[in-house]
């Protein structure tokens, strides 16, 4: 599913009117109908609930006023509009909606009467829509904080008021929505870092316009990864295949300081369905694993001061060819020293396989980007690692990750995942794929090592690196959904993610057949 900016929505509505004779007022009526249907289906006994509708001076407020009329017309009378209109220039469509509503529903001034909101069960937020690009007034900041502290169910129209729909930036303060009912397509800002704590479940309303028409008009190359998109990626495993044909993965990493990371990656690769996983680690720490993880094939490497020695480079490249390795992951637990730097840099220059580069290996890539441009490689940095690669602050990365990621892949023609809430995958053609999951459960030690193994595992099984990144990001995130369903909202570990992986993958396969 495409994600869109406010400008793209503006162009969409203009073309719908110009080319299909669909006027904006009809779209507003359809939006109100969509909102009404959601409220009626989601909340039992809706006619007996007190509903507050917050309306601003723009078309978002027009949607809210139209909703009030729909509710009233369907016998739901416990409605009050709290308006933010005094002294404001109101939109033409809002004027029409106010005229249609007449005096059927009580309208109060939110600046004067906001404390009365504590008496309402449901709050529909239509103050600001996708056009907000400035910081909100101090009075509204205070009111938004008051509303957020009430603990009421908040349903936002298009986007929670106070969020920049293009960047996800909080414009001073924003409402924390339990549900966001967004029109046509989801907005980019809903899935940006700044908005994570303000955006609940996102539900898309098509407003009676076929998705084929919308996609034909909207040129966005930012995509939300959903079940429909995954249908074109995931494959059903062949029943007759043997282990040698199920994919061979090599994990390179480990050091005397970090013994756990590479084993997490190796086990994750196995759990994706890879037939054979080889683990190349310093000889001394390979002895730690052997008795505990018999499924893994160990390749002991010469070490120097507890780190992988540069002398192993030729041996590793030989193993890749001799054993028919199809995908490699380098970095988990590998540590930082001069030998490791030389090993990582020369390995990436010489290797000709699909490669996942993660963790400390990312510390050495900045100086060789030109040498490896165009290779079948994916970097998987978190914000801190990305900041070192592109020499930008972590704060800048978090606020401008789409722009920074696009600039990076356009210049170096590499694959890139910027990890974090709603992780982003960038392919070399500058398409962006947004992971729908932003759960804090995934922020746990070793979670990134698991993702590395997942991507390498899928890559070895015949998936392109792009497909492996999209699918891997999704099942990694979906594991948190499964954990919440059966275990609760705390306590997910990297080892738990590995155990859950087959369930997450199986669900993707099951939905492919629906």
UniProtKB/Swiss-Prot annotation:
The record's free-text note on cofactor binding: Binds 1 potassium ion per subunit.
InterPro entries: Carbohydrate_kinase_pred_CS (IPR017953), CARKD (IPR000631), Nnr (IPR030677), Ribokinase-like (IPR029056), YjeF_N_dom (IPR004443), YjeF_N_dom_sf (IPR036652)
Residue numbers spanned by region NADPHX 1: 59-63, 129-135
Highest taxon, organism lineage: Bacteria
Keyword Phosphoprotein carried by entry: no
Signal peptide: none
Binding site for K(+): 60, 125, 161
Residue numbers binding (6S)-NADPHX 1: 158
E.C. number(s) listed in UniProt: 4.2.1.136, 5.1.99.6
Keywords: ATP-binding, Isomerase, Lyase, Metal-binding, Multifunctional enzyme, NAD, NADP, Nucleotide-binding, Potassium
GO biological process: metabolite repair; nicotinamide nucleotide metabolic process
MF terms in GO: ADP-dependent NAD(P)H-hydrate dehydratase activity; ATP binding; metal ion binding; NAD(P)HX epimerase activity
Family membership noted in the UniProt record: In the N-terminal section; belongs to the NnrE/AIBP family. In the C-terminal section; belongs to the NnrD/CARKD family.
Protein name: Bifunctional NAD(P)H-hydrate repair enzyme Nnr
Naturally occurring in which organism (per UniProt): Dictyoglomus turgidum (strain DSM 6724 / Z-1310)
């Amino acid at each position: 599913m495409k994600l869109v900016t406010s400008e793209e929505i503006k162009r969409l509505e203009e073309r719908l009117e110009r080319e299909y004779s669909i006027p904006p007022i009809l779209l507003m009526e359809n939006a109100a109908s969509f909102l009404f249907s959601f409220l009626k289906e989601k909340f039992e006994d809706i006619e007996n609930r007190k509903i507050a509708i917050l309306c601003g001076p723009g078309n978002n407020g027009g949607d809210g006023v139209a909703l009030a009329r729909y509710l009233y017309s369907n016998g739901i009378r416990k409605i009050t509009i709290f308006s933010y209109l005094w002294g404001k220039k109101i939109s033409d469509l809002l004027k029409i909606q106010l005229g249609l509503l007449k005096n059927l529903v009580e309208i109060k001034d939110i600046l004067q009467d906001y404390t009365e909101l504590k008496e309402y069960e449901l709050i529909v937020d239509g103050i600001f829509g996708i056009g907000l690009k400035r910081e909100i007034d101090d009075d509204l900041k205070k009111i938004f904080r008051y509303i957020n502290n009430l603990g009421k169910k908040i349903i936002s129209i298009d986007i929670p008021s106070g969020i920049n729909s293009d960047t996800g930036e909080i414009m001073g303060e924003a409402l924390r929505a339990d549900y966001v009912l967004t029109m046509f397509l989801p907005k980019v800002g809903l899935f940006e870092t700044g908005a994570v704590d303000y955006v609940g479940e996102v539900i898309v309303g098509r407003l009676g316009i076929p998705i084929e028409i919308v996609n034909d008009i909207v040129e966005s190359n930012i995509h939300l990864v959903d079940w429909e998109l995954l249908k074109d990626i995931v494959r059903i495993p062949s029943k007759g295949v043997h282990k040698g044909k199920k994919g061979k993965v090599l994990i390179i990493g480990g050091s005397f300081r970090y013994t756990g990371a590479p084993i997490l990656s190796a086990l994750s690769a196995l759990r994706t369905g890879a037939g054979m996983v080889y683990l190349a680690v310093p000889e001394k720490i390979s002895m730690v694993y052997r008795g505990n993880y018999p499924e893994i094939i160990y390749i002991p490497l010469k070490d120097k001061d507890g780190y992988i020695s540069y002398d192993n480079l030729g041996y590793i490249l030989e193993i890749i060819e001799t054993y028919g390795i199809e995908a490699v992951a380098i970095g988990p637990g590998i540590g930082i020293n001069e030998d490791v730097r030389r090993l990582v840099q020369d390995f990436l220059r010489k290797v000709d396989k699909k490669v996942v580069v993660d963790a400390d290996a990312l510390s050495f890539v900045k100086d060789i980007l030109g040498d490896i441009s165009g290779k079948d490689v994916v970097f998987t940095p978190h914000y801190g690692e990305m900041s070192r690669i592109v020499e930008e602050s972590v704060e800048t990365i978090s606020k401008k990750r789409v722009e920074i990621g696009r600039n990076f892949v356009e210049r170096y023609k590499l694959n890139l995942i910027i990890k974090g809430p709603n992780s982003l995958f960038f392919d070399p053609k500058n398409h962006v794929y947004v992971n729908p999951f932003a759960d804090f459960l995934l922020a746990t030690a070793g979670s990134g090592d698991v993702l590395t193994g997942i991507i390498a595992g899928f890559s070895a099984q015949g998936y392109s690196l792009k497909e492996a990144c999209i699918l891997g990001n999704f099942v990694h995130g979906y594991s948190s959904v499964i954990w919440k369903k059966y275990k609760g909202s705390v306590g997910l570990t990297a080892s738990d993610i590995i155990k859950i992986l087959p369930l997450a993958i199986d669900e993707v396969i099951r939905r492919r057949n629906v």
